A protein has these predicted regions:
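N-terminal accessory targeting/assembly segments
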Residues: 1-187, 191-196, 207
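Glycine-rich phosphate-binding P-loop
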Residues: 242-274
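Conserved P-loop NTPase nucleotide-binding/switch module
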Residues: 341-385, 389, 402-408, 412-429
Length: 565
């Protein structure tokens, strides 16, 4: 390992040379209180920035071991340090001048959710901290401007590192509150199922968001207040006793007029699979971690999926036990989404009437009289919802504003009235007695077949170069194949999408062998990530700074939408 003075001398020697001379700076340098690694140097000033990392020994960083003695605390601590590093790094970005991306400093910009990221990691055995980020090495045209890089690495960066990665220099009370919040959130999450619940929304939560393009809380809105009949309490280690609405296992229907907050509540529950930062308003909105949003998805591909639980006897004779299509309809796509969610071991379905295929959700009595059951290939969801819970243990939360048929199978009915939830179960059930229940199938359907096995990606191995590109939060591409994730609505961050792309690529190249089923592949992949970290997905000499942990549910959703599976 070289000293920082070696780097300083090297920069002096390459000043004003051709830009490729920067390649000689790769390596690790001792800056006294931390180590700076130049992991990858960009090819020219207009290319993607250089990859750098900071490494601080645990004894120097000084964070209490009690702040990282569990996985969820490690994630909370690293998330907080990433936010601090981002704040300080943003202030010094582009202070050094030059052409192209000269002077740029960048690191992951965290959103409202607390996610495990490659941007910052901590070694639980010794407290060593690593932060991975990017920097644009300065140039005049395509000539090395080493004086400006010296300014970046020796003049600007050290203060940034000192003020954000050392316990003695940060706001310790704020960090303590972050760790305490993570403990409180974990306490609710681990006790949710044993209390017979699939979700919890604390009294006083702020559910509406600032706008359709912002996840920040809306100001001056009606705060959430649980109806008495659904109010439960948790004794938390730091917050103390907290009360709120506990949604029980089973079938829950959320109804109400338009604009009264039904979908806002469901959206909060969707993202309740993640922890949220203090001040978000959804800190104590906690959902079953396996919950899946189910919706129609016209045009998606489906590969060898058993949708016979919902669709049978197609007029073209197509096999629905192993169904394939490149252009699914609303009903077939939603049927596939349900079965694929079952395959991921999801215990909770979240469904909004607004984004569902009507013919998949319901067939009323008049339609059943006109079009006989044997003439209709679709078995609607309402006829399977009770079976899903009683036979498979899968609860459902459904938002409905126009169809009252779900009053019949629902165990719990909540009305959103001017953003306030009310328990109307008894009244709704009484009213439903005057309306006939749709007839149910006489026989239970066989279990869906989850033995889909796919071969290794030989078509990829033949490629001279494999390129994975993230297309925002909603898609990624592997070479020319785009995986559309617009309707996988529980992806919270673009860096999760990037991780999904690399996860699919790794699974296709290294795990799929024609023998392991898709769920086994996903389990093996998630176990590898848990053991080795997200960076294990990469065939790279350095750790990419832009990956965030996805759930198994989204990993399998990405696999299922890959048209070359």
């Amino acid at each position: 390992m070289k000293s920082s003075s070696n780097l300083k001398l090297l920069l002096k020697n390459i000043d004003r040379k051709g830009y490729p001379a920067y390649k000689s700076t790769q390596g690790t340098y001792d800056f006294g209180t931390y180590f700076l690694s130049i992991d990858h140097v960009q090819g020219d000033p207009f290319a993607s920035p250089s990859k750098l990392s900071i490494h601080v020994k645990g004894r120097s960083a000084g964070f209490p071991a009690s702040f990282y003695d569990t996985k969820y605390k490690q994630v909370a601590l690293c998330d907080h340090l990433t936010r601090l590093f981002y704040q300080t790094l943003s202030k010094i970005s582009f202070r050094a001048k030059g052409s192209g991306k000269s002077g740029l400093f960048s690191v992951s910009k965290c959103g409202q959710q607390v996610l495990e990221r490659t941007a910052c990691t901590i070694n639980p055995s010794n407290g060593d901290i690593s932060v991975h980020f990017e920097a644009g090495f300065p140039a005049n045209g395509r000539t090395v401007n080493a004086r400006e890089l010296d300014k970046m690495l020796f003049g600007l960066l050290p203060d940034c590192v000192s003020s954000s990665l050392f316990y003695k220099n940060i706001n310790q009370k704020m960090l303590e509150s972050v760790i305490y919040l993570s403990e409180d959130q974990h306490t609710i999450r681990k006790n949710l199922s044993s209390m017979g619940l699939v979700a919890f929304i604390a009294d006083g939560s702020v559910l509406p968001r600032e706008s359709g393009i912002s996840q920040k809380p809306l100001r001056n809105c009606v705060k959430f207040q649980s109806p008495d009949t659904y109010r439960v309490s948790f004794d938390l280690p730091h917050h103390g006793t907290i009360t709120g609405m506990g949604i029980p296992k089973g079938i829950t229907l959320i109804v109400g007029g338009g604009y009264h907050g039904k979908s806002t509540l469901l959206k909060a529950l969707e993202l309740g699979v993640y922890d949220h930062v203090k001040g978000d308003g959804r800190e104590f909105v906690i959902t079953d971690p396996t919950a899946m949003k189910i919706r129609a998805e016209d045009g998606r591909s489906i590969t060898n999926t058993d949708i016979s639980m919902f669709i049978n006897n197609l007029p073209n004779g197509k096999n629905t036990v192993s169904f394939d299509t490149e252009d699914a309809s609303g009903s077939t796509s939603q049927a596939a989404n349900v079965v694929e969610a079952m395959e991921t071991d999801s215990s909770l379905f979240l469904i909004d009437e607004d984004t569902s295929a009507t013919n998949f959700m319901i067939r009323d009595e008049l339609m059943q009289r006109v079009v006989l059951r044997e003439q209709e290939p679709i078995t609607p969801f309402i006829e399977r919802i009770r079976e899903l819970y009683e036979r498979y243990g899968i609860s459902s939360i459904i938002v409905a504003g126009s169809c009252g048929s779900y009053f019949h199978p629902a165990d719990h009915i909540i009305q959103m009235d001017q953003y306030i939830p009310k328990d109307i179960t008894t009244a709704a059930k009484d009213a439903a007695k005057d309306f006939p229940m749709v007839s149910l199938p006489e026989k239970k359907h066989p279990d869906p077949c989850f033995d889909r096995c796919f071969n290794a990606g030989n078509h990829l191995k033949k490629e001279r170069k494999i390129k994975m590109k993230t297309l925002g939060k909603d898609a990624f591409s592997i070479n020319k194949d785009t995986v559309d994730l617009r309707y996988v609505e529980q992806i919270a961050d673009t860096e999760q999408t990037t991780a999904l792309g690399y996860a699919l690529l790794y699974a296709k190249l290294h795990l799929m062998d024609g023998k392991k089923d898709l769920c086994a592949v996903a389990d093996e992949l998630m176990q590898m990530i848990e053991t080795k970290g997200l960076s294990a997905l990469l065939d790279s000499k350095y750790v990419k700074s832009n990956l965030a942990m996805p759930r198994k549910q989204e990993v399998m959703a990405a696999m299922n939408r890959y048209r070359n599976l």
